[in-house]
């Protein structure tokens, strides 16, 4: 059974695209696009590519060879994904370069946390179009899971950030999937060429079985019509991604990817105000699925909810408590930036209106999602809370806010501001929380954001 391709992904020159236009045309509308001319000055495109345009594997074996990486065996299916092997980069390069038989498996190095492992090697700089990245700026400063004892070391490494390097020979591929957390992703070809097939979100149900549990693995193999009765109705968009091009993958778009040549790519998953509702919807769905899967032990288990949260974190990458703390810290960080800007700039000529609008939109979006969380049941663990006094005096939080400020200054082409001292911030923000200065529930966070946005809207006339 062949697939029906009905169109191609739009292409655009990145140098002719402002952040505002990108946000309006692609982030807000959740539409894919191929973007050119944003990678020419990357170190990776110089160091990692041979003169003939192929991957410079010698560089990886020489400088990064001891790194332990996950490698997919593209010819072997294991449950719902390709079989994974662990090896060093040197071992991977040796197997790649010594492959002399068509009977040998095609290997694909995936999900290499290169930036986290080599922070002093600046292989590339994230383009401003993709810099409003709540996920990775948060994980640069905090662990996703507060209850660290409940998670194995591998889980901590795998959730340390969502910035990856992929390397694979011609014929390597990735099965049909939608991205983690239903996040956005961007993928830049350092060298090589890829073929992408995209399925629009309204058709997602057509690639699942009648129970919405199992997804089609490979859209080019013979798909079982009894198991996947809707698959024959799917219509696809296609894209051939050339070297140096970046593809933006929106939330909820299932896709399957083939390397048409030996390829190296850089890939980020990220989320922000434009797709936060996608993240929450998936998290709540996965929570209910987790709850249902162990329902038979509810009456005999004293810590049923804790088990649900632990299983959710293991399967989805974060649980409800992780998400609540993430949103609480990020909200407070936005408030700190807005308070600092409003105090230091007495008129809008000195402060970017676009930046203020961006920060207020962030808070308004989090508020809406917290309202959904309240309706759904919210956070139940009593120990999950954010103490404002402790947080505003915490050097780790101040580094987090500094990183946020640097990000938004870069996006909106503003000078980076110094924000207020912890003492000044406590004085300004103390009236926004309850008398105990704690955010203990989604309801507390909603009230705090409402109070803050009322005040800030008056300042910025937004």
UniProtKB/Swiss-Prot annotation:
Q: What happens when the gene is disrupted?
A: Plants missing both JMJ20 and JMJ22 exhibit reduced seed germination efficiency during PHYB activation after red light (R)-pulse treatment due to an impaired H4R3me2 removal-dependent derepression of GA3ox1 and GA3ox2 causing lower endogenous gibberellic acid (GA) biosynthesis.
PROSITE patterns (UniProt xref): JMJC
The induction text for this entry reads: Repressed by the zinc-finger protein SOMNUS when PHYB is inactive in far-red (FR) conditions, but derepressed upon PHYB activation by red light (R).
The keyword Metal-binding appears for this protein: yes
Q: Which residues form a coiled coil?
A: none
Entry EC number(s):
1.14.11.-
Where is it made, tissue-wise? Answer: Mostly expressed in leaves, and, to a lower extent, in inflorescences, roots, siliques and stems.
GO cellular component terms listed in the entry, alphabetical order? nucleus
* Note accompanying the cofactor annotation: Binds 1 Fe(2+) ion per subunit.
Q: Main localisation, per the record?
A: nucleus
Q: Which cofactor does it need?
A: Fe(2+)
What is the reaction catalyzed?
Answer: N(omega),N(omega)-dimethyl-L-arginyl-[protein] + 2-oxoglutarate + O2 = N(omega)-methyl-L-arginyl-[protein] + formaldehyde + succinate + CO2
What are the alphabetically sorted keywords of the record? Gibberellin signaling pathway, Iron, Metal-binding, Nucleus, Oxidoreductase
- The UniProt record gives the binding positions of Fe cation as 177, 179, 255
Q: Name one GO biological process term.
A: positive regulation of seed germination
Output one GO MF annotation.
histone H3R2 demethylase activity
Give compartment(s): Nucleus
Domain called JmjC: residue spans: 115-287
- InterPro entries given in the database record: Cupin_8, JmjC_dom, JMJD6_ArgDemeth/LysHydrox
| Disulphide-bonded residues | none
Family, according to the entry, reads as follows: Belongs to the JARID1 histone demethylase family.
Report the protein's function: Histone demethylase that demethylates 'Arg-3' (H4R3me) of histone H4 with a specific activity for H4R3me2. Involved in the positive regulation of gene expression. Together with JMJ22, positively regulates seed germination by promoting the removal of repressive histone arginine methylations (e.g. H4R3me2) at GA3ox1 and GA3ox2 to trigger gibberellic acid (GA) biosynthesis.
Q: What is this protein called?
A: Arginine-specific demethylase JMJ20
Q: Which organism is it from?
A: Arabidopsis thaliana
Q: Which gene encodes it?
A: JMJ20
């Amino acid at each position: 059974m062949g697939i029906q391709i009905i169109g191609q992904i739009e292409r655009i020159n990145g140098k002719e695209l402002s952040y505002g236009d990108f946000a309006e045309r692609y982030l807000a509308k959740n539409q894919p696009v191929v973007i050119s001319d944003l990678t020419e000055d990357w170190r990776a495109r110089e160091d990692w590519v041979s003169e003939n345009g192929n991957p410079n594997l010698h560089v990886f074996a020489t400088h990064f060879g001891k790194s332990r990486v996950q490698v997919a065996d593209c010819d072997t299916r294991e449950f719902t994904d390709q079989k994974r092997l662990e090896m060093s980069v040197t071992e991977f390069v040796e197997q790649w370069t010594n492959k002399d038989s068509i009977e040998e498996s095609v290997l694909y190095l995936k999900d290499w946390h290169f930036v986290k492992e080599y922070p002093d090697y600046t292989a590339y700089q994230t383009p401003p179009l993709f810099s409003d990245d709540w996920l990775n700026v948060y994980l640069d400063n905090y662990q996703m899971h507060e209850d660290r004892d409940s998670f194995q070391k591998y889980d901590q490494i795998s959730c340390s950030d969502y910035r990856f390097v992929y390397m694979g020979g011609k014929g390597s591929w990735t099965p049909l999937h939608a991205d983690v957390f239903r996040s956005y992703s961007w993928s830049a070809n350092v060298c090589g060429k890829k073929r992408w097939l995209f399925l629009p979100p309204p058709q997602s149900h057509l690639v699942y079985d009648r129970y919405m549990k199992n997804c089609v693995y490979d859209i080019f193999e013979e798909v079982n019509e009894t198991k996947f009765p809707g698959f024959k109705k799917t219509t696809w968009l296609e894209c051939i991604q050339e070297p140096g091009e970046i593809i933006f993958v929106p939330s909820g778009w299932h896709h399957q990817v083939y390397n048409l040549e030996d390829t190296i790519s850089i890939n980020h998953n990220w989320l922000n105000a434009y797709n936060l509702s996608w993240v929450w919807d998936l998290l709540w769905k996965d929570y209910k699925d987790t709850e249902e899967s162990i329902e038979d032990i509810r009456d005999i288990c004293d810590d049923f909810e804790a088990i649900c949260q632990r299983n959710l974190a293991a399967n989805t990458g974060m649980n409800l408590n992780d998400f609540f703390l993430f949103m609480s810290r990020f909200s407070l960080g936005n408030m700190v930036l807005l308070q600092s800007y409003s105090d230091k700039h007495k008129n809008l000529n000195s402060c970017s209106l676009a930046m203020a609008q961006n920060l207020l939109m962030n808070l308004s979006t989090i508020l809406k999602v917290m309202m959904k969380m309240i309706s759904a049941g919210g956070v139940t663990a009593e120990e999950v809370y954010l103490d404002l006094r402790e947080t505003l005096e915490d050097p780790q939080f101040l580094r987090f806010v500094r990183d946020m400020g640097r990000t938004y200054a870069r996006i909106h082409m503003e000078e980076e501001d110094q924000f207020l001292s912890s003492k000044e911030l406590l004085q300004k923000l103390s009236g926004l929380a309850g008398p105990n200065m704690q955010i203990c529930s989604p309801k507390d966070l909603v009230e705090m954001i409402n109070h803050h946005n009322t005040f800030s809207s008056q300042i910025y006339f937004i």
